[in-house]
């Protein structure tokens, strides 16, 4: 494991509710969303170019597509923007009082898209898996604030955060990624330190977690030990 920190400000910007930074390695750009501002932002650090795109609805996450464009987790479901900016629904499932939140792309190409109620009703959200062929499966249906999702480098474990639980949970992955079992806590964030929100997994298999209301980023080992 490396020991350098390399922490700095990549870009100064503003948002009503900024969320979901994603590195698009193909295009060499950073993508993130302003959920309540209904905008997708991009930034190319090599050129300094920035773009802002308005979305159809409040947007919880935006991920790059292999065919170009973006897949977006919106208020009423999951949609697609093609390379020319044309919009279409991939999974349209309106639910009054609820919106899409964080989402992540699995090693098999499926999109795991979370949702939550605007008033954070306990158990009012879900975690949905959208297969590459568009088939939708509800994996969890008792979620409050569905947030970070990520996979171990070997694809055998999935990590997941439902923010109010204060936990980073881990599942075992089966059937090429289409099924998860054995949910259990990997780590728990102590009272007063903030709440776990977004996450990503590094090449060492360690889990990096951003803490909402904690002004911090932590790294946990695959065994659940806090090492940064």
Which residues does each predicted region cover?
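Short loop/turn segments immediately following beta-strands, especially the blade-tip
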Residues: 171-179
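Short, solvent-exposed loop/turn segments at conserved positions within beta-propeller repeat blades
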Residues: 35-36, 118-124, 163-166, 212-213
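A short loop-to-beta-strand structural motif that recurs across blades of beta-propeller domains
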Residues: 39-41, 77-79, 125-128, 167-169, ...
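Loop/turn-rich, solvent-exposed surfaces of beta-rich toroidal or solenoidal domains
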Residues: 167, 171, 188-225
